[in-house]
Amino acid sequence: MALFHNPEERPYKLPDLCRTLDTTLHDVTIDCVYCRRQLQRTEVYEFAFSDLCVVYRDGVPFAACQSCIKFYAKIRELRYYSESVYATTLETITNTKLYNLLIRCMSCLKPLCPAEKLRHLTTKRRLHKIAGNFTGQCRHCWTSKREDRRRIRQETQV
């Protein structure tokens, strides 16, 4: 992996890093900043899709694997949670439509799409302010947590 000593020349998004290194997302190799394990191909795509920033340690670029992202997102939630509001309340507070706000998933940190934001609005689910940013749940995390609750409920029934 190439070294980037000058912070002004560092690409901070994974697609930009690929362009700078003259490679593709499919061929890039990058390690996790937390566990130092090389990201698998699917994790590289998920990191790029999540629109997270590449970080640099001693000029070497790093990303984050999915297990570390979920782990540190939970720690972030437990440490920095401040409040929960309904989507309509958030629109009133910010004087901005939900569609124009950047809201990430509280579990996997992916940006919520308009349909996922609308789902929070119509089902009256709360958005949570964590570390100064509002978060919700993406479609994948919403359904997987629902399935986990359903499975636990079935296991406890005799």
From Swiss-Prot:
GO terms for molecular function: DNA binding; PDZ domain binding; zinc ion binding. The keyword Iron does not apply. GO terms for cellular component: host cell cytoplasm; host cell nucleus. HAMAP family: HPV_E6 (MF_04006). Plays a major role in the induction and maintenance of cellular transformation. Acts mainly as an oncoprotein by stimulating the destruction of many host cell key regulatory proteins. E6 associates with host UBE3A/E6-AP ubiquitin-protein ligase, and inactivates tumor suppressors TP53 and TP73 by targeting them to the 26S proteasome for degradation. In turn, DNA damage and chromosomal instabilities increase and lead to cell proliferation and cancer development. Forms homodimers. Interacts with ubiquitin-protein ligase UBE3A/E6-AP and thus forms a complex with human TP53. Interacts with human NFX1 and MAGI3. Interacts with human IRF3; this interaction inhibits the establishment of antiviral state. Interacts with human TYK2; this interaction inhibits JAK-STAT activation by interferon alpha. Interacts with host DLG1; this interaction leads to the proteasomal degradation of DLG1. This is Protein E6. It comes from Human papillomavirus 68. The gene is E6.
